[in-house]
Regions:
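Secretory targeting and sorting signals
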Residues: 1-33
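C-terminal region of N-terminal signal peptides and the immediate post-cleavage residues
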Residues: 23-45, 503, 607
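Conserved SxxK-family serine transpeptidase/carboxypeptidase catalytic domain
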Residues: 32, 92-95, 211-243, 247-264, ...
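Short solvent-exposed beta->alpha transition segments
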Residues: 34-40, 51-100
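Small/polar-residue-rich segments within soluble enzyme cores
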Residues: 102, 131-133, 147-153, 166-305, ...
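Short beta-strand edge/turn micro-motifs at domain boundaries
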Residues: 110-149, 249
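Short pre-catalytic segments that frame enzyme active sites
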Residues: 137-153, 167-188, 192, 282-370, ...
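Beta-lactam-recognizing serine transpeptidase/beta-lactamase-like catalytic domain environment
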Residues: 295, 331-362, 377, 381-586
């Protein structure tokens, strides 16, 4: 029995494109068709069929009922838009004939299926008619079979990190729901089993009795939980076959490592989902009266989408993650490749994760790491050079503000390079006090600080360095207190700027350009020539000596005070790897330095060779 299906409305079909009676034969090909041949009857049959008029076409056959059912099923199974039918050749002898034709079915999504076939004809009481058989629609179509169109979605592309390994790959999540009607009298037992079994995975189900009442009050299934493949393997044997439990596999892109930059990977997934599905393949199959596939009549393979690459580097990310995991509180590290702007790592410990992606969006006073900006501005304005002798008293009064050094240390008069390496607040407070209100704001922009970068796949905020007319505020801004704010992402850009000689445009997803709200003027060569050796001196003979064993590291430490505590900062670079490390409320900068040291020590020995 062929499944009945009505053809599409007549208006949705294109009329017969061409019906060409090429040749007729009475044992001889190439002769002019005889007037009483089967060609005219075949033309009428194809003409009706091509516009979806299956009833008329069926009446031109010797078995109208069976033909109509088969033709309706063919149109429905192919979901066809229209059909072009072309007669290639007509042959007949006495009361039998054969029409050789070419069908072009126009299918959804601009697909076409073209094939040649043969239609048997017979003359009955002087009138030619179609001798109906299923193989008249297609040479390989058997009796009581029809067509079905199958889509073969390509395997979704994966998302890779910079080293080539997958960070997101196609898989399934399993949606569990409860259908009270299907559960019937077993509803209470099913609900109690569901609450007990799913308790390790969700606390949202609550009281079994209330859940049963909720499920009974609606005709729709009630959501229970969404499980990963591994969790489904644990739950399904106990729950999957109970009355009323419905388990629906849902395709998804799944993290290959739940501990690999989870917040970043979640943002990447949202950004790239529309790029991961390639061109679907499709097949036309013959199916029997039970809907079971019998044979493939036509197949077009799909083309998968190319994989998407993100700039996170597994080696760097894992090293940074290991480093932040050694600290309590809220610790984070951002690593950027100065030569390209590629974001190599965004690592946070569990304490930081509670507040979202603090590493790229959290704003904090940067403390003395901001002295990279202040020193650069002073050099660019010809206020000082690394060798200029400047005062580093234990405290200094500027306007109505008294500025102390950490612990009140006093170096007297020293070269600016020494004041930078020892992190003299008083030195840089005095320098900033002599700058114009927009001096530090303009200087910060040269390092990307305060610039808005629309990085595809991740939300970023660099920082804020507002102009300051008030002398006391400008003084505090000079050593990273006051109203100056920066994210670890922003300070990593500052360090990357010194390393590269220009501010790199950050990027996370390969092939997705970053929009920048303004062009940052480059830092000058004299700024670079001064800042680089001063940042190296911080490591060799200053506040970051503890990381001196990790190769040629350049950096600037910072401890930013806030009421009741201080933040621990360290920013810098080594080779083509710039970083910023922050421990919120972590106290002395030595802790951020130690955390950064753990990161470098966790990299392969030859990584920065």
């Amino acid at each position: 029995m062929v499944t009945k299906a009505s053809p599409a409305p007549l208006a949705s079909f294109v009329s017969l494109a061409s019906i060409l009676l090429v040749t007729g034969a009475l044992g001889l090909a190439g002769c002019t068709p005889r007037p009483d041949g089967p060609g005219p009857a075949a033309e009428k049959f194809f003409g009706a069929l091509s516009i979806g008029d299956t009833a008329t076409a069926a009446q031109l056959s010797d078995n109208p009922n069976e033909a109509r059912e088969a033709l309706n099923a063919a149109w429905a199974g192919l979901q066809s838009k229209h059909l072009d039918a072309q007669i290639l050749n007509a042959q007949y002898a006495e009361d039998t004939g054969t029409i050789h034709y070419r069908f072009t079915w126009h299918l959804p999504k601009d697909r076409m299926w073209i094939y040649d076939g043969q239609l048997r004809m017979a003359r009955n009481e002087g009138r030619w008619e179609v001798r109906w058989a299923a193989n008249g629609l297609h040479p390989k179509l058997g009796e009581h079979q029809t067509f079905a169109l199958r889509s073969d979605p390509p395997r979704r592309a994966s998302v890779n990190e910079l080293g080539g390994s997958d960070v997101l790959s196609p898989g399934y999540r399993y949606h569990y729901t409860l259908d009270a009607a299907a559960a019937g009298p077993a509803l209470s037992a099913t609900v109690h089993a569901a609450v007990d079994t799913l308790h390790p995975f969700t606390n949202a189900l609550g009281d079994p009795q209330l859940l049963a009442e909720q499920a009974s009050s609606t005709t729709e299934p009630v959501d229970l939980v969404m499980l990963s493949s591994d969790d489904n393997d644990k739950v399904f044997p106990a729950l999957g076959r109970l009355p009323g439990i419905v388990v629906t596999p849902q395709p998804d892109m799944l993290p290959t490592d739940p501990h690999f930059a989870p917040a970043v990977i979640a943002g990447v997934k949202t950004s790239v989902m529309d790029r991961l599905d390639g061109q679907a393949g499709w097949r036309v199959v013959s199916v029997n009266q039970n809907g079971v596939d019998v044979a493939v009549l036509h197949e077009t393979e799909g083309s998968p989408a190319p994989s998407v690459t993100i700039t996170l580097d597994r080696l760097v990310q894992n090293a940074a993650q290991h480093a932040v995991n050694t600290r309590g509180g809220k610790a984070m590290v951002v690593v950027i490749k100065p030569s390209t702007g590629e974001i190599l790592a965004v690592a946070q410990n569990a304490g930081a994760d509670v507040d979202g992606l603090l590493a790229t969006t959290g704003l904090f006073p940067p403390g003395s790491t901001f002295k990279m900006v202040t020193a650069g501005a002073a050099i660019d304005r010809d206020m000082a050079t690394p060798n200029t002798m400047l005062g580093c008293p234990g405290r200094i009064d500027i306007g109505h503000r008294t500025i102390p050094n950490y612990g009140g240390f006093d170096l007297g008069v020293v070269p600016m390079s020494r004041a930078f390496a020892s992190s003299c607040n008083t030195t840089f407070a005095e320098l900033s006090s002599k700058m114009p209100p927009r001096g530090l704001s303009q200087a910060a922009n040269q390092y990307g600080l305060g610039v808005d970068y629309q990085v595809e796949g991740i939300t970023t905020v660099t920082g804020s360095v507002p102009p300051t007319v008030d002398l006391a505020e400008r003084t505090e801004d000079g050593f990273g207190q006051g109203k100056v704010l920066a994210s670890p992402f922003g300070m990593a850009l500052v360090a990357a700027t010194v390393a590269a000689g220009k501010t790199p445009v950050p990027q996370l997803i390969a092939g997705r350009p970053t929009a920048v709200d303004r062009d940052a003027p480059p830092i000058s060569p004299k700024m670079l020539d001064a800042l680089r050796p001063m940042m190296r001196l911080v490591v060799t003979n200053g506040t970051a000596k503890d990381i001196g064993s990790c190769g040629e590291v350049y950096g600037k430490t910072g401890e930013a005070e806030f009421p009741g505590g201080s933040h621990s900062w360290f920013a810098g670079y080594r080779g083509d790897l710039a970083f910023a490390s922050l421990i919120v409320g972590g106290g002395s900068s030595e802790y951020a330095v130690r955390m950064t040291k753990v990161m470098f020590e966790s990299l392969p020995p030859d990584f920065l060779a």
